[in-house]
Amino acid sequence: VLKVVGTKLKQMSRDVDTPARYGGEEFALLMLNAPFDVAMRRADQLREALASNYLRNVTNGEIYGQITVSVGVAKHRATDSIESFIARADAALYEAKTSGRNRVVAEAA
């Protein structure tokens, strides 16, 4: 699953973006100079693209389920430290997970 997510994240990234694995099952995509609405749209496109993939047993083809992701989106501010930026993205991710999973949530205003 991690390989599928990482590959799809890289495929959907622009040349100026930086996709990365961040922690055990978490990924990050730094989108240079992207408007917030574009970042939100890209996150939802990624979520939809991954949901079209099914986990299958390689031996018998049995379907285990879809790949789902929860995404938190934050915008870097000029006054941000890396820690404050990541904290806002993590808070949005936590909200996505606790509000039903398989969704994209923007940072709190």
Language-model features and meaning:
Residues 6-14, 32:
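Short regulatory alpha-helical coupling segments
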Residues 6-7, 38-59, 90:
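Alpha-helical scaffold within the catalytic cores of cyclic-nucleotide enzymes
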Residues 19-21:
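A short pre-motif secondary-structure segment
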Residues 32, 40-43, 75-108:
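Catalytic-core segments of nucleotide cyclases and related cyclic-nucleotide turnover enzymes
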Residues 65-69:
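PAS and PAS-like sensory/regulatory domains
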